[in-house]
Amino acid sequence: MFDVTLLILLGLAALGFISHNTTVAVSILVLIIVRVTPLSTFFPWIEKQGLSIGIIILTIGVMAPIASGTLPPSTLIHSFLNWKSLVAIAVGVIVSWLGGRGVTLMGSQSQLVAGLLVGTVLGVALFRGVPVGPLIAAGLVSLIVGKQ
């Protein structure tokens, strides 16, 4: 009873540890635990809701400085007066738009998801990236191949 998927996950977790990327390693180890225990019954829910929950947690992390007062309102207001901040705002809008296209593409062309996931894991593990890659990558792919 050789489980190729488990072997792939273990290899990716090892890659995460070797590259000192605990985000990848811990995430994959959690998925391995889910896979080899009765928790595997939750995979359909994780697959359906995981992305939304991840985006919510990411948004909480990004918005926390505003909510805590670490980033004062005056700094936010000044961000509309500085050209570098305006560039950051424009890039944020573009990247968010790409992410939206990416979600649509991932839902409509599931055959691309494996490539996007492998590319993201490699980018996170080898280049110290962060796992927001699949959405942005899918958005970029949608510009090249179309949403269809």
Swiss-Prot record:
Pfam family, one: DUF441
Name of the molecule in the record: UPF0756 membrane protein YeaL
Residues passing through the membrane, by range: 14-34, 51-71, 86-106, 121-141
Subcellular location: Cell membrane
Family: Belongs to the UPF0756 family.
Membrane topology: Multi-pass membrane protein
GO cellular component, as recorded: plasma membrane
Superkingdom per UniProt: Bacteria
Organism field: Escherichia coli (strain B / REL606)
Keywords assigned: Cell membrane, Membrane, Transmembrane, Transmembrane helix
